[in-house]
A protein has these predicted regions:
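Phosphate/NTP-binding elements of NTP-utilizing enzymes
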Residues: 2-313, 318-320, 405
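Short acidic-glycine loop/turn motifs at beta-strand connectors
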Residues: 151-153, 343-347, 453
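Acidic, glycine-rich loop-and-strand cores that form catalytic or ligand-binding grooves
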Residues: 452, 456-458
Length: 554
């Protein structure tokens, strides 16, 4: 593979035997080692299996073959590789780099790998692991500033693609790889990284995870699909999870568990496994999801024997105007304190157990909202004539329902009341959850959708069409709830959701704020379920029963 061309204009004199297919090189009897090398370098699938020793699946090999062909023929094409989560996208790219380093080690030239944040370190670690082959072990070198991996005269240089990083000046002779494409800044990529390909019409490969329709990855997908429509050359490789599961039975089991846990249409499952953008599906609670939330059970006026109940409380601030019974509130637009009672039931196929904290159904118990307590502005710990303390009213309500556990939003004004309820009911029966902060609320929203999408959240039916009723208010808030994704667009980290503060609705009393207090109260049960699932909580059901006696002499 020695090159006779000048360093300024590299020429890939590797067409024979590398691109003629298997069995077209010298006879094994004339030069076994040369024949074996040419045989294994003729196809990245063979190289993966026999040199690296970690055979790639067909769904990984197929796009890599197209990329290798573009690199060797200097077609200058761009490719997009999107695989379901944890199905080997980065493994495939690491093996591609090792293959090209081995193929080009005498010819020379450079490849560039760009990523943001942790993606850069992951790419380097994976490459080092895959360079540990009989052909490359002890022969590759690592250099710094920027980090560079060299095998013979070929190299891969790793650069940060963050807009504030100093990454100019490098050349991608053969290949440019950009990882985490969903997080890339399009203007920065076009200004800094795309020109690196110019000198030798290098191939570009974009990797990433599906997030939003407006990010770099999805926009690039549209561009490349248009190019393919014009010339027929495939450029976009979106690997469906079914293709992965067909080749990897273990992945099929894993995928089934994710769908069972979150639901097929949960944004995490839809985006990361089924490659569907999360912002193209309506609001946070589109009609199909709202239908999942509607139960067939009525609202209850009191607890029933032998049923297990929990409570979720979204606590609002107090209003100074509440010092007198019937007096006008100083801030009538403030949120309400809402306590939602949930009944825990199990699927019909479940075996009854005394402790629902132990998984007795696939996915866990079903949470059915059966009642709600609402208060507007009452002082938490100060009574007034004809106006009891909110603390006492809440305690009476929780005791009347004999709740097995209570979760309360303890952020801000909630910590004091949470501590007071814990002292009154028992600390093992009260969870004070800090909902303040975007990360905690993002996770709560994601967990709530997992409950809904797996059929385990149900709100009572019967009054949803009666204006100003509790059920009506809940569904108005569900409809008004919006969402957005910030930062990297990770649904369980970057979700921003809630009813806009400016949202208003026309009621028989006039135009009123919509609020999101009933929705947030109900949502808190998802945090209760997360803790139950993780083993941090165990809900006990107790009942008095008369056990018939038995004659010991009979």
């Amino acid at each position: 593979m020695d090159s006779t061309s000048s360093p300024q204009e590299p020429s890939l004199a590797v067409s024979s035997p590398f691109r003629k297919g298997l069995g077209r090189g010298p006879s094994p009897t004339s030069n076994d080692r040369a024949w074996l090398a040419s045989h294994l370098l003729a196809d990245i699938g063979l190289f993966s299996r026999h040199v690296i020793g970690l055979p790639l699946y067909d769904y990984q090999v197929q796009p890599l073959r197209a990329i290798v062909d573009a690199v060797l023929s200097r077609q200058g094409r761009e490719f997009l590789l999107v695989f379901p989560r944890q199905s080997g996208k980065n493994e495939a790219v690491a093996q591609l780099l090792v293959y090209l380093l081995a193929l080009l080690q005498r010819h020379g030239g450079q490849m560039v790998y760009g990523a943001i944040g942790d993606g850069l370190g992951r790419g380097m670690r994976r490459l080092e692991q895959r360079l540990d082959t009989p052909w490359t072990r002890g022969r590759w070198r690592r250099g710094g500033r920027p980090t560079r991996y060299t095998l013979g005269q070929a190299a891969v240089v790793f650069l940060s693609s963050h807009p504030q990083a100093a990454s100019r000046g490098e050349t991608a002779d053969h290949l440019l790889i950009l990882d985490e494409a969903q997080d890339q800044d399009a203007a920065h990529i076009e200004a800094v990284f795309t020109p690196m390909r110019a000198a030798h019409n290098a191939t570009a490969v974009y990797l990433g995870t599906v997030r939003r329709t407006g990010d770099f990855l999805w926009v690039k997908k549209g561009e490349l699909e248009s190019a393919t429509a014009a010339d027929g050359h495939p450029r976009v490789f979106l690997v469906a999870p079914d293709a992965v599961a067909a080749e990897n039975p273990a992945y099929a089991i894993f995928l089934a568990e994710q769908v069972r846990r979150y639901g097929r249409r949960h944004p995490i499952v839809a985006a990361e496994y089924f490659l569907e953008p999360v912002d193209g599906r309506g609001g946070l609670f589109p009609p199909w999801r709202a239908a999942f939330m509607r139960g067939a059970h009525p609202r209850l006026g009191a607890p029933r024997p032998d049923e297990l109940y929990v409570a979720a409380i979204d606590l609002a601030g107090q209003d100074e105007g509440a010092a007198e019974a019937g007096g006008p509130l100083h801030n009538p637009g403030h949120d309400y304190t809402v306590a939602t009672i949930f009944r825990l039931t199990e699927a019909a196929e479940a075996v009854e157990t005394e402790l629902l904290g132990r998984n007795s159904v696939s996915g866990g118990p079903i949470y059915e909202a059966v009642d709600v307590f609402v208060d507007h502005g009452s002082r938490h710990f100060q009574a007034a004539p004809g106006q009891p303390r909110l603390a006492d009213t809440l305690l009476t309500y929780l005791r009347r329902w004999n709740v097995a556990h209570t979760i309360i939003d303890a952020a801000g004004v909630g910590q004091g009341l949470a501590d007071w309820l814990a002292a009154a009911l028992g600390r093992e029966r009260v969870t004070a959850h800090q909902l303040g902060g975007s990360g905690a609320k993002a996770r709560l929203g994601s967990d709530l959708l997992a409950l809904i999408d797996t059929g385990r959240f149900r709100y009572w039916t019967g009054d949803e069409d009666e204006p100003l009723s509790d059920g009506w208010w809940f569904w108005q808030q569900v409809v008004a709830c919006g969402y957005s994704l910030s930062g990297a667009g990770r649904f369980d980290h970057d979700l921003r959701w809630g009813v806009p503060a400016a949202a208003r609705i026309t009621t028989p009393r006039g135009v009123e704020p919509t609020h999101d207090d009933r929705l947030l109260s109900a949502a808190l049960v998802a945090e209760l379920e997360r803790r139950r699932r993780d083993g941090a909580l165990l809900f006990g059901a107790s009942a008095s029963r008369i056990i018939p006696g038995r004659d010991p002499l009979s």
